[in-house]
Swiss-Prot record:
Name this polypeptide is given: HTH-type transcriptional repressor NsrR
Keywords: 2Fe-2S, DNA-binding, Iron, Iron-sulfur, Metal-binding, Repressor, Transcription, Transcription regulation
SUPFAM superfamilies: Winged helix' DNA-binding domain
DNA-binding region(s) from the entry: 28-51
Cofactor info, note text: Binds 1 [2Fe-2S] cluster per subunit.
GO biological process: negative regulation of DNA-templated transcription
């Protein structure tokens, strides 16, 4: 299983914001420069993260983006569920004639649940706290 770039960059954006001093604002432009991703793509990601409460977006001259809640309260599994379409196969009778008797979907769903269960054990704070190499890579030019 591979996460979509949408989820990948969503997690990266959250990691970047969590690496900043608590409450510090950043901008979508700054995040896109750090990761070298399209601004349009990042705008869509930040909008989704904001809609889900993971990011707070403030408009205006002194506006910007920052975490919508403490990094310790952001569960990695919740972020992945919010951003990632988690269907591994297209199991509708329209696309596959064995759908009525197939057990593969059950097995794959169990695998996804175990994957998410593991991600639920980790917070955004765990990914960034006391991580000097990460701070250096992300924040040296900020």
């Amino acid at each position: 299983m591979q996460l979509t770039s949408f989820t990948d960059y969503g997690l990266r954006a959250l990691i970047y914001m969590a690496s900043l001093p608590e409450g510090k604002m950043t901008s979508i432009t700054e995040v896109t420069q750090v990761y070298g991703v399209s601004r349009n793509h990042m705008v869509k990601i930040i909008n989704q993260l904001s809609h889900m409460g993971f990011v707070e977006a403030i408009r205006g001259k002194n506006g910007g983006i920052r975490l919508g809640k403490p990094a310790a309260d952001i569960i990695v599994g919740e972020v992945v569920r919010a951003l990632e379409p988690l269907s591994l196969v297209n199991c509708s009778a329209e696309f596959c004639h064995i759908t009525p008797a197939c057990r593969l979907k059950l097995v794959l769903n169990q695998a996804i649940e175990q994957f998410l269960k593991e991600l639920d054990r980790h917070t955004l704070a765990e990914l960034v706290e006391n991580n000097s190499p990460l701070y250096k890579l992300l924040l040296e030019d900020v």
